[in-house]
Amino acid sequence: MLKESSRTDRKEDEMPGDDKDIEACTSRCLDCYRSCLQTTSQHCLEAGGAHVEPGHFRLMLACAEICRTAAHTMLVGIEQHGRICAACAEICRACAESCAGLDGMSECEEACKRCAQACERMA
């Protein structure tokens, strides 16, 4: 009779970070995804000016998407999530910096910083 292998028995399923760290990082990524996407659509578009400057606006959209992707890779449990998290941290840092000089962006800026810190621990 074949032994049923559990997820923890298989080498290819090992991921950096323990379950608590992964859960915390996933939560931070989803928070940042939500914050960036809502802020672009509900604040930046309304505010106009520097808030919709192409470089800033594209960075916020990219940040939202990489955060969603990082959360997805951790939720599905692939071992390569650390590389996605490293890219996520880099983009989140850039997004936080871009948001820092604009009014009404402090919540998004802080969400990006928290996500970057969590992702750096996973990378």
For the regions a protein language model found, what residue spans apply to each?
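Amphipathic alpha-helical hairpins
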Residues: L2-A123
